[in-house]
Amino acid sequence: MNFFESLDTAAWRNQSRLCVGLDPEPARMPDCLPKDAEGIYTFCAAIMDATVDLVCAYKPNVAFFEAHGAAGWSALERLVKRRPGPPLILDAKRGDIGSTAEAYARSVFTTLGADAVTLSPYLGSDALEPFLRHADRGCFILCKTSNPGSGDLQDARLADGRPLYLAVAEMARDCWNMRGNVGLVVGATHPAALADIRRACPDMLILAPGVGAQGGDLEATVRAAAAGDDPRLIVNVSRTVLYADRGANFAAAARTAARQLRDAINAALRAV
């Protein structure tokens, strides 16, 4: 089963388009857990177990594990190996040239065993190809990101008047998706850009981070990005789920938050 089949299976089984981002910030974690690599492993594993029937995917951000050195990377490896069912998208934002890109692709897909990865397109097609050739894995191209400064470059206008983010989306559609394993990362904080990209790429999967703590509006995101009966949309939420409670019942609180978000996404989809 390839990544997209695994994603569709989890989405159908759990009636969910929610992806939970695993961004374990020690300062925000429950007080009952240690703030070291073992603590972030325990925290993320508990979140996954509590939400396994409510999500379509998980998205661990590699930076929060790398910050703990070798022990943090080991914690990430353990999480990937013990994932409970829904596929895992490694939020690594890789992008480099030649043999370096080849090594990154081996690290992500062969050594670690992630189901999908986020990629930066700005070094060009040759930097993406080592990942793209893994046809059974997902490759999510950073297109219009959710951060406030994304417009510094991504909104820049080309000679033909298109914003750079739209050119990236169209290249993903026409050049990089030959194996059918490419999706786009488009921030929920930019609903107008979401709508532009959906019009240009009606058949591509969109991963939309930024709902919740970053200020993205769920209903506006769904209206802009959903694509008919098969919405081709994953809504990623991190902090609202992870840090729903800092007490010993943090996992139960995360489950409640995830259920509410899943149901809200489904309600928004029905309203489109």
From Swiss-Prot:
Q: Where is the active site?
A: 93
Record's superkingdom? Answer: Bacteria
What InterPro entries does the entry give?
Aldolase_TIM (IPR013785), OMPdecase_AS (IPR018089), OMPdecase_type-2 (IPR011995), OMPdeCOase_dom (IPR001754), RibuloseP-bd_barrel (IPR011060)
UniProt entry tagged with the keyword Kinase: no
List UniProt keywords, sorted A-Z.
Answer: Decarboxylase, Lyase, Pyrimidine biosynthesis
The entry assigns this protein to a family as follows: Belongs to the OMP decarboxylase family. Type 2 subfamily.
Query: What protein am I looking at?
Result: Orotidine 5'-phosphate decarboxylase
Q: Whose protein is this, by species?
A: Roseiflexus castenholzii (strain DSM 13941 / HLO8)
